[in-house]
A protein has these predicted regions:
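Intrinsic disorder at enzyme termini
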Residues: 1-13
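Buried hydrophobic positions in well-ordered alpha/beta secondary-structure cores of metabolic enzymes
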Residues: 9, 20, 53, 60, ...
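Hydrophobic, small-residue-rich alpha-helical packing segments that form membrane-like cores
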Residues: 135-136, 151
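A short, Trp-centered hydrophobic/proline-enriched beta-strand micro-motif
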Residues: 120-128
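Short secondary-structure junction/hinge motifs that connect adjacent elements
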Residues: 26-49
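A short core secondary-structure module
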Residues: 141, 150, 154-168
């Protein structure tokens, strides 16, 4: 197993490390203590990432991402953690919803959501936890049935992380 980094990965690591050193001090530290108060702070950080080209690292450039490989994306995470960067607020949007919309969504859905996910304007959550399921997705019972004017949702959820902040 080879543990040395390629010159491309090492260069990306140095770039991220420099960016973190130059930009993290610009955030209004300390991070606010309660979740609702964190929203402007998180959005500011996400906006900084977007403007610097560090949002949607593995997304296709067609959809506003950088189109880089998973190795360099993991280097970004390593360097962000080492630098004490705040956690990303919109991981569900950026890591799950956005790529799904990019792959399967209509052009209208892509236009409406992808950029707003990357900039942090819209926060996404996932509703998996149910009384009899936990996170066992195969046993979920909640259903969405198409009806005139939208969908009828039947089922029950226990909790959802950051739901109170989510647009979707």
């Amino acid at each position: 197993m080879e543990f040395t980094e390629s010159p491309e990965v090492a260069g990306f690591r140095a770039e991220v490390r420099t960016w973190m050193a130059e930009n993290l001090p610009k955030l209004s530290w300390p991070e606010p203590p309660d979740l609702e108060s964190k929203l402007p702070f998180w959005r500011s950080y996400q906006s900084m990432l977007f403007e610097a080209g560090y949002a949607g690292l593995t997304w296709s450039t067609e959809f506003g991402g950088q189109g880089i490989d998973e190795r360099r994306a993991s280097v970004f995470t390593e360097e962000a953690q080492s630098a004490g960067a705040p956690e990303r607020l919109n991981t569900i949007g950026e890591d799950f919803a956005g790529p799904t919309i990019a792959h399967f969504g209509t052009q209208e859905q892509k236009d409406a959501h992808l950029r707003r996910i990357l900039t942090g304007e819209d926060i996404w959550c996932q509703l998996f936890s149910e009384p009899e399921s936990g996170s066992d997705l195969a046993s979920l019972r909640t259903k969405a049935v198409k009806v005139e004017g939208g969908y009828r949702i039947t089922g029950q959820k226990i909790w959802t992380s950051r739901a109170q902040l989510a647009s979707y």
